[in-house]
A protein has these predicted regions:
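Beta-sheet repeat architectures centered on beta-propellers
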Residues: 4-61, 71, 654-804
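Conserved, function-critical positions that sit in or immediately flank catalytic
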Residues: 185-320
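Catalytic or ion-translocation cores adjacent to nucleophile or general acid/base/metal-coordination motifs
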Residues: 617-656
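Long, charge-dense tracts
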Residues: 135, 158-165, 308-523
Length: 804
């Protein structure tokens, strides 16, 4: 074999698994615990510095623990850790534990938003965090966001505004008011069968209101409702019978047997109202149990009209008819025992034979009805409405009954002189500028659309004035859910002082305008939030195929002085540039976005099957925003992508190993490109990536795998005039298990665990340490000297020496 003699300019190009013939010069088979540098060449990595053991009771962390670092300032740097049962916070500079809600020893997760016991994933895979200034948003990817159905906007008051728009001589102004009043009264009729003939008893009344049971079909003769059929059933002495119940409007009929249980209809809807009760035996035979009693309970409407007159007068009759197709009436009238009315004595009843085919009705002349037997049917106006007048305005308010009513204005000027506002109007111009403070009304938009309807509330110029001049301001629809359930929202962890954290749920602004159609909740409602991001002064969440960005701004203070984010519109009459953004990706495949990373002026979205870009024009607004697919490369969502400078790095599965892609915008073609940077080491990085971080100042990327948790796989790169001149892979090995790490400036912080006991500690590695560092003891060992004296007392009497 001939001797090959060549020169290598350096040995900084790192590991390559390619054949020797295709490798670049300066690459090697293995590089362990060295650092590649275009300035210093190949140098040994710096040693670790012990900071402190975690926890007074020796905190243990497994590879499933969630770890997140917080870089508040050069003097305050923290790490938050969730080991599956508790959330801890520590200062990585001093090693001191930080309090959470004023308590040391960790925040117990059980029964809270941080409880991951029901998740099929570990705490590491279930939790995600994003830090913005002094606040950290913590996401539980197994928790569904819900709404708070207990907190709703007030129901609409049953009141109307009546105002004179135009006055004229000898013109008539009037109102038609139609309404129901008071509590319905009821009566009972006991009917006793004495023979086997078939009878159907029918019942009529003025205007019943509520429903217990009913249905069927029939016809109306005057004010009397007749039955044809209604099939329902009951069991009487183990025999099934048919019950015929008539049809009417707003009535309540209850049928009960005196012996073996209750006979009742099955349909209680207002559309199927029982008026006539009849019984038929098996095989079409008629009941022949002598002494069998049927009880009918009928509820009647009490409806006084405005001014004291009744809508249905007290002459409304309750009549009982006997129906037989071939015979005249055969009932023993003496056995119809009583009619019991509330607060009234029992009146007489009329018994009329009736031919079911409608050919003839035989009635006596002495039809007697209820005739004042319900003493409270007529009620005074004052009990039903109150009136308040100020100037040309009358406020008509429903009384204690609070039931709905209809009102219509009439005038002698073609309907343009007297105005009425009740529940809704056709246009905002239909509303007076002199009204009751707090009066709310719906303003209809396009008749074919519901999304353009909106609601307004009157505010007097003088807030202490009940009725007066003022203006109409937009408000929320009545009886509308206002906000999300606080306990289902992500956590917001605030750094309130040195080594102090406050934990609370994210506050969201309650819905203040519109309704479920014009201002729906964000699309994360009823869904699981996957991740969070902060982009162009908007807090964002990714959920399914949607990206949701809050109202522009760093949140806002509410009336209580508390900080909150708004995910609803502030007006539904127009679309504002600052309004929240809720947009879905454009893709022909099922897409589940799990991460987002800002890149220059755009937001890059990552799904398992592709990447998307969210962008707007000069301003990001609901009108200018768009989301489009840009690349279709696989992404492993076990860890979030890492943004370093103008590049984004993200992992993907490469068989039983892991590959890394470098995502960037090509400045020449203005096209996004995703380049694999592990082409020379396809079998180097193990799978099951747990943590992924990088340093912009050191052009360094670090990767931790659960399959090799005592090694960090490192990638060092360097660009010169848009050309990458260094692309070096290597690894750093430790005698401790690495649970998490983070690059902050030129320092690498690691959370490590004893390889045997899993007792955890904080250590750090300076990346550009030159051997001289203030605050470190330096001692030169000469000759046979075996001892030295330390000027400090290390915690736990454990000392790590950096030997050089």
């Amino acid at each position: 074999m001939p001797l090959i003699n060549t020169s290598l300019p350096n040995l900084i190009q790192g590991v390559s698994q390619q054949p020797d013939a295709t490798r670049f010069s300066g690459q090697c088979d293995e590089q362990v615990n060295f650092m590649s540098s275009v300035v210093d060449g190949l140098t040994k990595r710096n040693g670790t510095r012990f900071v402190r053991r975690l926890g007074a009771a020796d905190l243990t962390l497994s590879g499933d623990s969630f770890i997140h670092f917080i870089n508040r300032s050069e003097t305050e740097r923290y790490v938050m850790m969730h080991n599956g049962t508790k959330l801890y916070a520590y200062n990585v500079l001093s090693g001191d534990e930080a309090t959470i809600d004023g308590t040391y020893g960790g925040y117990t997760a059980a029964g809270t938003y941080l409880d991951v016991s029901s998740s099929t994933e570990s705490a590491r895979d279930t939790l995600r965090a994003t830090t913005v200034a002094d606040g950290t948003f913590l996401i539980n990817r197994s928790s569904t966001v819900s709404v708070d159905n207990t907190a709703r906007s007030p129901s609409l008051d049953k009141e109307a505004l009546i105002f004179v728009k135009q006055g004229d001589y000898e013109k008539e102004y009037s109102l038609d008011i139609n309404y129901s009043s008071k509590t319905p009264a009821s009566a009972q009729i006991n009917l006793t069968y004495t023979r086997s003939d078939y009878f159907t008893y029918s019942l009529t009344s003025a205007s019943p209101v509520s429903v217990v049971g009913g249905g069927g079909s029939g016809y109306v003769n005057g004010d009397e409702y007749k039955v044809v059929t209604y099939p329902a059933s009951h069991t009487y002495n183990n025999v099934t019978y048919s019950v015929d119940v008539g049809e009417g409007e707003d009535t309540s009929v209850t049928v009960a047997a005196n012996a073996n249980g209750t006979i009742a209809t099955t349909d209680t809807s207002l559309a199927n109202i029982g008026r006539i009760i009849g019984f038929r035996g098996p095989g079409g035979r008629y009941l022949h149990d002598v002494g069998y009693t049927v009880t009918l309970t009928v509820t009647l409407e009490k409806s006084p009209g405005l001014g004291g007159t009744t809508k249905y007068d007290n002459e409304a009759l309750v009549k009982v008819y006997s129906e037989n197709s071939t015979q005249a009436f055969h009932a023993d009238t003496s056995r119809i025992s009583e009619l019991i009315a509330k607060g009234a004595t029992s009146p007489d009843l009329d018994i009329d034979p009736y031919n079911h085919n409608g050919a003839s009705i035989h009635s006596t002349s002495a039809n007697s009805g209820l005739n004042d037997r319900f003493p409270n049917i007529i009620a005074g106006t004052n009990a039903d409405f109150t009136l308040a007048r100020e100037g040309n305005l009358i406020v008509l308010t429903r009384g204690a009954n609070k039931s709905d009513f209809k009102i219509k204005a009439k005038d002698g000027l073609g309907g343009g002189a007297l105005g009425v506002v009740y529940k809704e109007v056709g246009a905002i111009t239909d509303l007076p500028l002199f009204a009751k403070n707090g009066f709310r009304v719906k303003v209809r938009g396009d008749g074919d659309l519901t999304a353009d309807d909106y609601y307004v509330e009157f505010k007097t110029d003088d807030e202490n004035q009940d009725i007066g001049p003022g203006s109409w301001v937009e408000t929320i629809a009545p009886d509308t859910v206002l906000n999300y359930a606080s306990a289902s929202l992500p956590l917001f962890i605030t750094n309130t002082g040195l080594n102090e954290f406050k934990l609370e749920h994210l506050r969201t602004a309650p819905r203040s305008v519109g309704d479920e159609t014009s201002n729906p909740f964000a699309s994360f409602s009823g869904q699981v939030i996957q991740n969070s991001v902060f982009f162009k002064n908007r807090l964002g969440f990714v959920c399914g195929s949607n990206v949701i960005l809050s109202e522009a701004g760093l949140g806002r203070e509410n009336t209580e002085g508390l900080f909150e984010y708004n995910f609803g519109r502030t007006t539904v009459t127009t679309l504002l540039d600052s309004d929240p953004i809720d947009i879905s990706v454009e893709s022909d495949r099922v897409t589940n976005i799990t991460a987002a990373s800002a890149s220059q002026e755009n937001l890059i979205l990552f799904a398992e099957n592709g990447q998307f870009v969210l962008k707007g024009e000069e301003l990001l607004t609901p009108r200018t925003v768009s989301v489009k697919p840009i690349t279709n490369f696989k992404y492993n969502n076990e860890t979030d992508p890492v943004s370093i400078g103008s590049h984004i790095y993200y992992p993907f599965d490469l068989g039983n190993n892991t590959g890394i892609r470098e995502f960037a915008l090509n400045k020449t073609t203005d096209v996004y490109e995703s380049t694999e940077i592990t082409e020379q080491v396809p079998r180097y990085i193990p799978k099951d990536i747990t943590y992924f971080s990088g340093s912009l100042s050191e052009n360094l990327l670090g990767i931790l795998s659960n399959e090799d948790d005592q090694s960090l796989y490192m990638y060092r790169y360097f660009f010169s005039e848009n050309k990458k001149v260094l692309s070096s892979w290597f690894k750093w090995e430790f005698n401790m298990k690495i649970r998490g790490f983070e690059f902050i400036d030129s320092m690498l912080y690691l959370i490590v665990a004893n390889a045997t006991t899993d007792i955890s500690s904080i250590v750090s590695i300076p990346l550009n340490f030159d051997g001289e560092d203030e605050g470190l003891a330096a001692y030169t060992v000469n000759g046979g000297t075996l001892t030295t004296t330390l000027t400090v007392s290390p915690n736990d009497n454990v000392t790590h020496l950096d030997m050089r």
